[in-house]
Each structure stands twice: as C-alpha cells, then as structure tokens.
C-alpha cells in the first residue's frame, strides 16, 4: 500500500495533533513535551506509516506503563510526576536520533518504505536498522524501569551485583530484564506487521525480515543493559536521609551508593540509544 508524501503529511499533522493534545491533557507530556512530540510524530508519519507506528508503540505503551503502580513509584522515585509529564528534552532524547535517521533514510529512498536488504542498499539497511535499534532501546529501557521497580525482588547493581535500594541507577532485576526483552520484541513485531502493508520485498528477502524480531528483542535487552552500566558508573546515585529516597545529586545529607556525577538521566538515555542504534545498524547490514 503505497501512499504519497503529501497524503502522509496531512495524515501526520492530524494524528500528531490529536495524540499530542490528548497526551498533554492526560499529563503524559507537559506543554513543551506536547509541542516536541507533535513535531517528531509529524516527521515520522510523513516519512512512513511504519516509522510512525514504531514511535507510537513506544510512546503509548511507555505512557501506559508509567501510570501503573503510581503509588509505589511515588514512594521510590524522587523525580516522580503524575502521569509522567515528559518535557521537550525527554521527548527529543527518546526520538531525536530516530527523527534524523528517518529523514535521511527517506531522502535516499525517495520517501518509499523499503525492506531490510543489504544487497539493494547497505546504507539504507543500516539506517533502518538504526531506527529499529533506537526504539527497541527506548522501549526496553522504559519497560524495564517502569515494571522493574514494581518487582518485589531486590535490585542488584549491574557492575558489582551487590543489592541496592530501588531507584538506584544501574540497579537491575530479572523482571526488568525480561520486560526489556519483551519491549524489544514488541518493536520488532510492529515493524514486521506494518511492513506487510507498506513495503514489498522479493520472497527470499521477505523471509529474512522475520529476523527483525530476535534482533529487536536483543536490541531492547542490550539497550537496557547499556543504560544500566552507564547509570551505575557515570550517573550519581545516593541515599538522602532527609527525603528517605535515592537521589541523583550529591549533598550533605546524601550517602553515595554508586556512580560519579557526569550525566543525568536524559544524558544516559541519549548515549545508550546512540550506542544501541549504532550496534543494531551494523548488525542489520550483516544479517540482512
């Protein structure tokens, strides 16, 4: 099902406006996040319905999971906001790289959806692989964080495997890692299913597209692990005796748990997404 860029642009503006407004009203995004969300969603859907679907699956599932167990998260997360209320920085950290890759890929393909096929174009395959890795990482990290904190299991610091308090950057649980794997799988399935309607491949190439699912699943897990390693090493975590919570900045009432104060959560997310996108793009060229 091939559609013109003009039609996709009109559709993109309408659907992006509705979702951004709804998300703002439901406090999933603040005003700046709503504006940024509208822009990146418009870019994705104009580029292709499959790219828009990847962004939408990540955003909608993550927003839903953010609201699960809010009372428990409020007691643990020092930066807890009802509904999430993500701002423009968070939106761009989680979709900026993909937006650039989407525009480059579509410019090279004449704004047509293409299958992963290195024989046809290694560059386009690498770009599409990077987009898949991007959202697998975003989804994996978010599902892992939002569901892992609800687990009754004691988190362990990924670098030392020592037990740490919930909310500690770099703390992992089995439930969180399984959630990351499931999140990556969801992204892969979305890419594959929408591709049935938006891209046409030769039979041998079409069969290989099934490998997107395990690739995306591993990208979700890998992205979550990279995020955890960065969080445990170059992001500060300490326990505040006054607030009785894990905090991300040193202070007179804060006892250090792990990490040095180099990057904040947005910085860690950005770097982990960048690395996962790069690794997935390279893997895609060799696999497809």
Curated annotation (Swiss-Prot):
<keyword id="KW-0812">Transmembrane</keyword>
<protein>
    <recommendedName>
        <fullName>Protein PGR</fullName>
    </recommendedName>
</protein>
<feature type="transmembrane region" description="Helical">
    <location>
        <begin position="1"/>
        <end position="21"/>
    </location>
</feature>
<feature type="transmembrane region" description="Helical">
    <location>
        <begin position="177"/>
        <end position="197"/>
    </location>
</feature>
<keyword id="KW-1133">Transmembrane helix</keyword>
<feature type="transmembrane region" description="Helical">
    <location>
        <begin position="29"/>
        <end position="49"/>
    </location>
</feature>
<keyword id="KW-0472">Membrane</keyword>
<comment type="function">
    <text>Involved in the glucose-triggered developmental leaf growth process.</text>
</comment>
<keyword id="KW-1003">Cell membrane</keyword>
<dbReference type="Pfam" id="PF01940">
    <property type="entry name" value="DUF92"/>
</dbReference>
<feature type="transmembrane region" description="Helical">
    <location>
        <begin position="91"/>
        <end position="111"/>
    </location>
</feature>
<feature type="transmembrane region" description="Helical">
    <location>
        <begin position="123"/>
        <end position="143"/>
    </location>
</feature>
<dbReference type="GO" id="GO:0005886">
    <property type="term" value="C:plasma membrane"/>
</dbReference>
<comment type="similarity">
    <text>Belongs to the TMEM19 family.</text>
</comment>
<feature type="transmembrane region" description="Helical">
    <location>
        <begin position="210"/>
        <end position="230"/>
    </location>
</feature>
<feature type="transmembrane region" description="Helical">
    <location>
        <begin position="268"/>
        <end position="288"/>
    </location>
</feature>
<dbReference type="InterPro" id="IPR002794">
    <property type="entry name" value="DUF92_TMEM19"/>
</dbReference>
């Amino acid at each position: 099902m091939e559609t013109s860029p003009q039609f996709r642009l009109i559709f993109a503006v309408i659907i992006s406006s509705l979702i951004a407004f709804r998300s703002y009203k439901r406090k999933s995004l603040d005003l700046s996040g709503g504006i940024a969300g509208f822009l990146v969603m418009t870019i994705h859907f104009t580029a292709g319905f499959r790219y828009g679907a990847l962004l939408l699956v990540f955003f909608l599932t993550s927003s839903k999971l953010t609201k699960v167990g809010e009372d428990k998260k409020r007691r643990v997360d020092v930066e807890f906001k009802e509904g999430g209320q993500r701002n423009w920085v968070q939106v761009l950290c989680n979709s900026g790289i993909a937006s650039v890759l989407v525009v480059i890929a579509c410019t090279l393909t004449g704004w047509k959806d293409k299958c992963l096929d290195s024989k046809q174009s290694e560059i386009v395959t690498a770009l599409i692989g990077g987009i898949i890795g991007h959202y697998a990482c975003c989804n994996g990290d978010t599902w892992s964080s939002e569901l892992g904190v609800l687990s009754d299991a004691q988190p362990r610091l990924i670098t030392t495997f020592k037990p740490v308090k919930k909310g500690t950057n770099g703390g992992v649980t089995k439930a969180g890692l399984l959630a990351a794997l499931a999140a990556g799988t969801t992204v892969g399935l979305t890419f594959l299913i929408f591709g049935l309607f938006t891209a046409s491949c030769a039979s041998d190439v079409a069969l290989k597209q099934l490998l997107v699912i395990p690739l995306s699943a591993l990208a979700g897990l890998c992205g979550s692990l990279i995020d955890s390693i960065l969080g445990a090493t170059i992001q500060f975590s300490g326990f505040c005796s006054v607030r009785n919570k894990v905090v991300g900045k040193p202070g007179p009432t804060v006892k250090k748990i792990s990490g040095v104060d180099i990057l904040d959560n947005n910085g860690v997310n950005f770097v982990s997404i960048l690395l996962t996108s790069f690794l997935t793009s390279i893997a895609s060229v060799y696999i497809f």
